[in-house]
């Protein structure tokens, strides 16, 4: 073997071998335990970033480890290829989204191969191909026939610049997350899937997900937002209809002093006919976005509608206000306000001088002080007529029962979760397979017209979707009658909700899934991706699995047994202030830094001499220009070094700070491993290891080897603390580097140790390990080698450390054979100078001996 470690030479050779041998291609095999390891599929943006590299390295380490345990391991990859960025890039580069996307896929595929990930490339899929989305379209038509799909007019966040609907989460500070244009409210007809029909199951089955992070489960619970309460009907004077509100706190009902309705509510619209102030307010609300996260913090505003509702229990008239914190699409579009016991209602009432009536006593039994804030804790009722003295639960039931008996109340279970709006007014997505006939009938596209293919050879003007701009595209014939196709496309969360299942049978032509293959591989054993997907993707992913189960395609309730959310990758961020006061972000690669004695950055400038402001470590991003190109790092250090650093620098679920000094350290370590194997193999063949003939020192070294195997196995397999596994291998390497290599058994022991080290490192650094395994004459390819097993006998300690005390004070620590008797330990202790000194001329009155640990001599 060559003396120097040259990753640029070995890595491409090993990758070619994997390609030619199709090492990672798998098929169903009932005789083997399966393991399905999946990382979230990437969007083909054009280049991999370090976040991708971290995600896929974690997945590859787990997949290779499980393979070495003898399991049938599936690790597929594909491309989440539809979406808005392709449209923007196409306009910018004067091309169409399809060629831009396919070019990116080809480029990024090479980048993934360059990093040595062990994917089954025969299963690669791209969600923008008709071969993929045809089954999604077919499934949608089946859901429609089952009554799980409907169309309704809905208020949306509309970006006038991108001409598209935005999800609440895509509205930041009232503006579009992508182009920063002010968002408007707009009513348009859209398609919905009834995820609410599965709300209870989605909620209850979270309890089955023992190996999902609690944070993700809590976020989903809150998002589904199940609550039990009462729906109450109010009569409104001089108004033709009643108002219905929902409350989870009927115990506070006697403190209700006003009602609030959404600006879009029919009552507000009617009142605005003669109220210019209210009309202007409604207009303002129409153009304000309603992302829930912002609802809590935005300024609460309202206008009195002039209508008065009648409190069903007290008969009092209470005002009805239009307020910006009430949403038409949540519940009934109206809420009851109890300012004494709800902080939002309190702030609104204080601002507009509305009545605040306390009805719950403070914890000490006194009347609450409402001069500064509402009392939101539960407690005993007062000021509530016949309900005085009741605690929360009793009052909840008594008031609910009375309202029900009067015919103005009904107990209800409510959900925050809304049905999933899947319509997007974009071009680059899967066409929604619905048609409208000449007579106005709306129906699913017939099976013989599926897939509805998206034309790829289009011209983008950056404003109108090409399939909306071309009236011919929508024309079709159904049942002999002219019809128009739907020109909206699916939300791209549709494609990413079922791809994991299609990986089990990507070539299957008879339907969406081959149930036999799907049920062999599913559920996914470990799913790896960022926590930012906790509520949207991961909820739709679970929902789709249940839909496919109910369609008879899969036989499990949940799509993934374990979820691992990797931490973000951070890097140093620098900027200088430009002439107009703007911040110009400078890549950390271009920053020349000075550090103090503790290694902290104290000064920085760029090549042009600008003084740079250092803002610390922050998430790698385009906006701060602090991304590090993985390709540059691989070309500089090799893929194995980058992978090793990624897994060593931080626990997988914590943030990782990118430090090139750490990358250099990982590279030095691999050079040391190479050097040790080189020096060992240069001495020629090795004799067989005779464990019975080992010296004490050799036994001690072998004990270290097998203890390391045991620790690394536990760290990777059970604990998934990959960084501590690598640290243990490094520690063992330090010992091996100092071990004698002269004797026959020294070399035999070194051979055993190096074969173990190379196999333990293999999941992390597969190229160097593939090569070193061959140099060490390991059996076959390392890709088919079994994981090393710790020898229990080798780990047994021959000797143990005993603490010797005289009258409870430590006087010595002695090493004795594990099987030494108490007499032998006392005799050995007596040979210690300090112990002998304290025993001289005194009588030992009592001996306390804890075998193998402690000897305490009580003297007097």
Swiss-Prot record:
The keyword Hydrolase does not apply. Keywords: Aminoacyl-tRNA synthetase, ATP-binding, Cytoplasm, Ligase, Nucleotide-binding, Protein biosynthesis. It catalyses: tRNA(Leu) + L-leucine + ATP = L-leucyl-tRNA(Leu) + AMP + diphosphate. The keyword Protein biosynthesis applies. Monomer. Belongs to the class-I aminoacyl-tRNA synthetase family. This is Leucine--tRNA ligase. It comes from Escherichia coli (strain K12).
């Amino acid at each position: 073997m060559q003396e120097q470690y040259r990753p640029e030479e070995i890595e491409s050779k090993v990758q070619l071998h994997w390609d030619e041998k199709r090492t990672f291609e798998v098929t169903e095999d009932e005789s083997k335990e399966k393991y399905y390891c999946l990382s979230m599929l990437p969007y083909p943006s054009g280049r991999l970033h370090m976040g991708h590299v971290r995600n896929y390295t974690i997945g590859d380490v787990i997949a290779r480890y499980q393979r070495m345990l003898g399991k049938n391991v599936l690790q597929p990859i594909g491309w989440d290829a539809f979406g808005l960025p392709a449209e923007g890039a196409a306009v910018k580069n004067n091309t169409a989204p399809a060629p831009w996307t396919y070019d990116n896929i080809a480029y990024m595929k090479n980048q993934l191969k360059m990093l040595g990930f062990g994917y089954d490339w025969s299963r690669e899929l791209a969600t923008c191909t008709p071969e993929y989305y045809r089954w999604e379209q077919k499934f949608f038509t089946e859901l429609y026939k089952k009554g799980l799909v409907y169309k309704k007019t809905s208020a949306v966040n509309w970006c006038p610049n991108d001409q598209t609907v935005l999800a609440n989460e895509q509205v930041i500070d009232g503006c579009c997350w992508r182009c920063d244009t002010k968002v408007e409210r707009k009513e348009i007809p859209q398609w919905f899937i009834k995820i609410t029909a599965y709300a209870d199951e989605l909620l209850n089955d979270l309890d089955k997900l023992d190996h999902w992070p609690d944070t993700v489960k809590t976020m989903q619970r809150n998002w589904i937002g199940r609550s039990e309460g009462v729906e109450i009907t109010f009569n409104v004077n001089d108004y033709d209809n009643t108002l219905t509100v929902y409350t989870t706190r009927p115990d506070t009902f006697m403190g209700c002093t006003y009602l609030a309705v959404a600006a879009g509510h029919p009552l507000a619209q009617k009142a605005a006919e003669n109220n210019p102030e209210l009309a202007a307010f409604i207009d303002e609300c129409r153009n304000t976005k309603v992302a829930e996260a912002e609802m809590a913090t935005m300024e609460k505003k309202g206008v009195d509608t002039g209508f008065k509702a009648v409190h069903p229990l007290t008969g009092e008239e209470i005002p009805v206000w239009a307020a910006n914190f009430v949403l038409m699409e949540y519940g009934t579009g109206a809420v009851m306000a109890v300012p004494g016991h709800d902080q939002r209602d309190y702030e609104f009432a204080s601002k507009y001088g509305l009545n605040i009536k306390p009805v719950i006593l403070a914890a000490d039994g006194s009347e609450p002080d409402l001069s500064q804030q509402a009392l939101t804790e539960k407690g005993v009722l007062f000021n509530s007529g016949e309900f005085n003295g009741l605690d929360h639960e009793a009052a909840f039931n008594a008031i609910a029962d009375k309202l029900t008996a009067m015919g103005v109340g009904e107990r209800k279970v409510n959900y925050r979760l809304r049905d999933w709006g899947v319509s997007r007014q974009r071009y680059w997505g899967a066409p929604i397979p619905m048609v409208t006939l000449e007579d106005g009938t709306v129906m699913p596209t017939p099976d013989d017209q599926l897939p509805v293919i998206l034309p790829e050879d289009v011209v983008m003007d950056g404003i109108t979707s090409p399939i909306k701009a071309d009236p011919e595209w929508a024309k079709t014939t159904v049942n002999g009658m002219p019809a128009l196709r739907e020109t909206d496309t699916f939300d791209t969360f549709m494609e990413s909700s079922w791809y994991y299942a299609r990986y089990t049978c990507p070539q299957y032509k008879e339907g969406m899934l081959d149930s036999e293959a799907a049920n062999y591989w599913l559920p996914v054993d470990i799913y790896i991706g960022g926590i930012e997907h906790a509520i949207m993707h991961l909820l739709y992913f679970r929902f789709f699995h249940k839909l496919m189960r109910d369609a008879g395609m899969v036989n499990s309730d949940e799509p993934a047994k374990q979820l691992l959310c990797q931490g973000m990758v951070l890097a140093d961020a620098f900027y200088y202030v430009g002439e107009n006061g703007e911040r110009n972000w400078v890549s950390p690669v271009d920053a020349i830094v000075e550090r103090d004695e503790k290694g902290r950055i104290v000064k920085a400038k760029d090549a042009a001499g600008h003084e740079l402001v250092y803002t610390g470590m922050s998430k790698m991003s385009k906006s701060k220009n602090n991304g590090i190109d993985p390709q540059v790092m691989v070309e500089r250090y090799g893929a194995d070094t980058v992978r090793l650093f990624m897994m060593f620098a931080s626990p997988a679920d914590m943030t990782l700070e990118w430090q090139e000094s750490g990358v250099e350290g990982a590279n030095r370590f691999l050079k040391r491993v190479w050097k040790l194997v080189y020096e060992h193999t240069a001495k020629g063949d090795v004799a067989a290891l005779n464990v019975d003939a080992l010296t004490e020192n050799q036994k001690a070294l072998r004990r270290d080897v097998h203890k390391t195997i045991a620790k690394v196995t536990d760290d990777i397999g059970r604990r998934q603390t990959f960084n501590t596994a690598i640290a243990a291998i490094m520690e063992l390497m330090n010992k091996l580097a100092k071990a004698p290599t002269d004797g026959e058994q020294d070399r035999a022991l070194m051979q055993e140790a190096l074969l173990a080290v190379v196999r333990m490192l293999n999941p992390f650094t597969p190229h160097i390990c593939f090569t070193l395994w061959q140099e060490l004459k390991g059996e076959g390819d390392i890709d088919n080698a079994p994981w090393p097993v710790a020898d229990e006998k080798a780990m047994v300690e021959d000797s143990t450390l005993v603490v010797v005390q005289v009258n409870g004070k430590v006087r010595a620590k002695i090493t004795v054979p594990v099987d030494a008797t108490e007499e032998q330990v006392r005799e050995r202790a007596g040979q210690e100078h300090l112990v002998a000194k304290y025993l001289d001329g005194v009588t030992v009155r009592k001996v306390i001996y804890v075998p193998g640990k402690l000897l305490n001599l009580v003297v007097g």
